[in-house]
Amino acid sequence: MTESGFRPTGTPDLAVAKSHNDFAMLEPREQLATLLKEHVVGRPFSELAAVTFDHRAATVMGHVLIDALEDAGYSIDDFDAVGALTAASVPMVSAMIQAAASRGEDLDGFVMDFVYPSIKGPSIEGRRVVLLDAWLSEKSYVQTSSLVTLRNGNELSLDFGIVEQLGAKV
């Protein structure tokens, strides 16, 4: 029975289409929150790859991240490049590049390489950068675990050292 009291009718594929349409009607932040709940709830620690590589997240993730930066008082004009700290955060970087482009803004991306401490991507020398990570634990929030702006002396000093050595401003 449904909420209306009637028995559902139609083929099973219609129910799937309805649930997809319900998801599409959500605001972008709500879509991302729904995906996070599906993949993270009940897990004490998650890399978020199941979310960042999901096709539904790919369409909204970049805009949500840029909006989160703006909500924190930053403008897209405050940074020149965005970098991925882990493999799971690479789609986040790509999504931000595409979201910025759709807004008429230029934003480059890069990936941190920890095998040979360096970056992969356009030069970040003299550029202002934001680093992204895609880890979530019960004791953190999405905004603080997935959006990391490095400062001198924090726990990511290796990452900061590589970026600083390449002449970027974090």
What do the PLM-derived regions correspond to, one by one?
Residues M1-V170:
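PRPP-associated nucleotide enzymes
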